[in-house]
């Protein structure tokens, strides 16, 4: 979320909320905190709005599996560097390649990715985060 003059807020979205004890949350995926410009004096002179995105990242093993699938689908050499920050477009993927990558991910992880969600995937990390979100919904 963003705000221009009076203040701003930090928003982290969540799929589930399970209280364990006062002040503790299990499977935290969302927190919204108001932020005063007084807390950040350097922002007082800024006329533009700002946003801070904090996301919970997928497990390293999920990212590694996605990297492997991306390399396979794009027929990249084994020594190609593919990591969470790798953009599909930078790896040479076109829209058809991206569809094939998503199909490979669906098969590997036993999930179904809706078209709208598939279109939002731009990086390996995006794909891994979406996979974990879908698997969590599925109960894995």
Swiss-Prot record:
PROSITE patterns associated with the record: CARRIER (PS50075), PHOSPHOPANTETHEINE (PS00012)
A Pfam family of this chain: PP-binding
PTM (free text): 4'-phosphopantetheine is transferred from CoA to a specific serine of apo-ACP by acpS. This modification is essential for activity because fatty acids are bound in thioester linkage to the sulfhydryl of the prosthetic group.
Molecular function as annotated in GO: acyl carrier activity
Keywords: Chloroplast, Fatty acid biosynthesis, Fatty acid metabolism, Lipid biosynthesis, Lipid metabolism, Phosphopantetheine, Phosphoprotein, Plastid, Transit peptide
Entry-annotated residues carrying O-(pantetheine 4'-phosphoryl)serine: 95
GO cellular component terms, A-Z: chloroplast
Transmembrane regions: none
Pathway terms, separated by semicolons: Lipid metabolism; fatty acid biosynthesis
Family assignment from sequence similarity: Belongs to the acyl carrier protein (ACP) family.
Family annotation (PANTHER family): ACYL CARRIER PROTEIN
Role description: Carrier of the growing fatty acid chain in fatty acid biosynthesis.
NCBIfam families, alphabetized: acyl_carrier
Protein name: Acyl carrier protein 1, chloroplastic
Gene: ACL1.1
